[in-house]
Every structure is written in structure tokens, then in C-alpha cells.
Amino acid sequence: MFIIVDSLTGLSLRFARKIGYPVYQIDKDEIPFDQGEFFLITRSFNFGEIPISTIRVLRKHYQKCIGVAVSGNRNWGTNYGAAGDKIQEIYKIPLVLKFEGSGFEHESEIVKKYIEERGHE
């Protein structure tokens, strides 16, 4: 089990590192897709769109993704974290969490618990 993160400013990367699993960045690291399932942490941009870099990963590997957490800005109202809603709808990947910035400690615990409950300790 590992985490893939799509982070523009580094805040989502900081959130990902709090969870306690190996972290790989889209477009920066060699991602070991052959090592099984992963959890995705991505972001919304343009008021709720899915980043192209995330779409490229999901098109090829969505079957191995057990869940997604998405960063966003609450100032966007109904578009807050909307990329996560779209990923859930298009790829049928459970949206586990929406968070702002680098998230709070209790939010990273939500993701960690979700992963552990699926037998990925």
C-alpha cells in the first residue's frame, strides 16, 4: 500500500506524509504501480476540476485506487473539493475526505483509518 499525491504547492504532499505510508508524487517520482493498491490524494483547480496529471494516472490505474482525498478551498462554495466528487462519479473510487491546505491531524487520521480498515496496515 502506498499513497500517490498530486500536489502543486506542497500542501497536499505535507498532508500525505502525515498518514504514514510511502508517498509518491505524480510527475516527480517513479510510481511503483506493480506493487498493488494505492490511495490517491489530489487537488481541485479551476473551481473544482480534476488536474490533467491526476486524470492521466487514473485512466491507466484507477482499478488499483482504493480511495481518494482531495484538497480544495472552502471559498469555492459548492465547488469545494469538487474534483473528488467527479473522481468518485467517473471512476467509482470512494471519496474519503475533502480538506483545506495541509489538513488537520484528525483529517489525516480519517484517511489512515480508512486504509487500515481495508486491511492495508
Description of each model-found segment:
Residues 1-51:
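N-terminal beta1-alpha1-beta2 submodule of the flavodoxin-like/Rossmannoid cofactor-binding fold
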Residues 35-121:
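FMN-binding flavodoxin-like domain, especially the glycine-rich phosphate-binding loop
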